[in-house]
Amino acid sequence: MLYIGIDLGTSAVKLLLMDSEGNIRNIVSREYPLYFPHPGWSEQKPEDWYEQTMEGIRELLKDADKSQVAGISFGGQMHGLVILDEKDQVIRPAILWNDGRTTEECDYLNNVIGKEKLSEYTANTVSYTHLRAHE
């Protein structure tokens, strides 16, 4: 049996193919660009993630018996924001964990609601209020 691990990182997607004994059969890394449209902003195109992941899987499995793949696991960036429309289509570049455009809104909400309570309600940092006000 073979297993695939996928790590969607900030600068690249890393893929690993491992057998049931824990032997690494193949490792692939596919880079994608970061975009900085304004100072302090950090974005990526989810389409780039998808394309590089799919290409990476093809490369990872090129010499493997695909019928032996028994499992796949994913990991990725935390606290990114991917906005979808009502048809689950991406409508703008993803706002990444290291983006600083929402500092003012985050400070306001943390002061008004309280950082602990806000985290309890949302289980994430505040970033969507900036979009409502500016996009």
Q: What residue ranges belong to the model's regions?
A:
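Short, glycine/acidic-enriched loop or turn micro-motifs at the edges of active sites
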Residues: T10, T102, E135
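Acidic-residue sensor for enzyme active/binding pockets
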Residues: E43, E105, E135
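Conserved small/polar residues in nucleotide/adenosyl-binding loops
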Residues: T129-E135
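Carbohydrate-associated surface elements
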Residues: D99
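Short glycine/proline- and acidic residue-enriched helix-loop micro-motifs
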Residues: K115-T125
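Hinge/lid segment of periplasmic solute-binding proteins
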Residues: T103-G114
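N-terminal glycine/serine-rich phosphate-binding loop of ATP-dependent small-molecule kinases
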Residues: M1-R92
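Glycine- and other small-residue-rich loops at beta-strand/loop junctions that grip anionic moieties
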Residues: I95
